[in-house]
């Protein structure tokens, strides 16, 4: 039976494996550059910036959901769901829904003003999941912007 629990420091190597698996699925295998040390410190160091729930079954972690707190000047603190990952072989068994339901409970418990996340426009299974179970709003008006570390370093002061 699948149990949902809070992630612990010892889960980090497995979580990073799953993150790499997701990057391959999302056609970006070389984009995962975070080290295990940095990842672990960021979640379990003196000032954690992310939190996770893991799905565990018979000592194996087939999935997890990771979030951080985002601040909106209009709405206050919101949960930002960075990743919800379930291994390909474990999909279709309700693990994603168990994780998402637990994340929703966390958002309620922490009194966040809402939840936000992104989904790739071609990822139909994920889009259908969020529509089917959660009637999520999809906002086509906003465009994601970013600067890479290299771009930041190249910008003059």
PLM feature spans:
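A short beta-loop-alpha structural element at the N-terminal edge
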Residues: 3-15
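Conserved GNAT-fold acetyl-CoA-binding loop/helix
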Residues: 16-41
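A short helix-loop-beta-strand connector motif used in the catalytic cores of GNAT acetyltransferases and
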Residues: 42-54
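Conserved beta-strand in the GNAT
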Residues: 54, 60-68
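Conserved acetyl-CoA-binding loop-helix of GNAT-fold acetyltransferases
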Residues: 92-105, 132
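Conserved active-site alpha-helix within GNAT-family acetyltransferase domains
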Residues: 97, 121-140
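Conserved GNAT acetyl-CoA-binding A-motif
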Residues: 108-118
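Conserved beta-strand-loop-alpha-helix junction that forms the acyl-donor binding cleft
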Residues: 117-126, 146-148
């Amino acid at each position: 039976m699948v149990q949902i629990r809070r992630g612990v420091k010892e889960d980090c190597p497995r979580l990073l494996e799953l993150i790499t698996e997701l990057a391959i699925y999302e056609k970006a295998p070389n984009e995962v550059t975070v080290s295990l040390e940095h990842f672990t410190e960021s979640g379990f160091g003196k000032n954690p910036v992310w939190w996770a729930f893991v799905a565990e079954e018979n000592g194996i972690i087939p999935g997890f959901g990771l979030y951080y707190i985002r601040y909106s000047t209009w709405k206050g603190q919101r949960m930002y769901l960075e990743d919800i990952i379930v291994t390909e072989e474990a999909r279709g068994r309700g693990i994603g829904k168990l994780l998402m339901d637990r994340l929703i409970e966390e958002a309620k418990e922490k009194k966040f003003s809402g939840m936000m996340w992104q989904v790739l426009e071609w990822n139909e299974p994920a889009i259908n999941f969020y529509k089917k179970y959660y009637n999520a709003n999809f906002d086509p008006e906003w465009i994601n912007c970013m600067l890479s570390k290299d771009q930041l370093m190249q910008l003059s002061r």
